Amino acid sequence: SEWLEVEVCDGSARYYQRFERGVAVEPLKNTGPTEEKGTSVAFKADAAIFEETTEYDYDTLLRRLREQAFLNAGVYIVLRDQRGTEPVEEHLHYEGGIRSFVEHIHKSKGVEPIHDEIIYLAARDGDNTAEVAMQYNDSYTDLILSFANNIHTTDGGTHESGFKTALTRTMNDYAHKYKLLKDDEKFSGEDVLEGLTAIVSVKLTDA
């Protein structure tokens, strides 16, 4: 960044420091007492590094921050654009987490769920967590979005392939148990995924 300013409040004091192109231009300063807690970061992108543009696209930021609000249930994010004569502001807060993500996708695609309840599964192993939210709709296409540590894994990964494999196996086990399929028949992965919207999110500590 061309410049960056950081302000940290720890509940007793407020601290401030400024950097220019990665170098501190002044020492860390205690700017006074405060009961507030939190961190504020302001910066200006460096045109010498980002040669194509240093302009921020509001829709891109909104899409990314909304994604983060879905993936972290209860987080409150405010996106405010003050570049124009009329400020634009969006408040992002989803107590339903990735379940709300599935609802949002269905509304934006204009499709209708074919069962009322969004299926939600969560598991924890130490500090590692996994979440799945899924619901079938009246379309013929599937949409599986997977994330690792809040990063969209566009090329999939073991968390996504594992989910698909487990879902297909579970559907086949159920169908055979209740005689919905003959013993020599089975659903394919494509059969099981048709019309499915699913969010798979894992959060892993560093190995």
Model-derived regions, located:
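GHKL/Histidine-kinase-like ATPase module
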Residues: 59, 66-68, 74-207
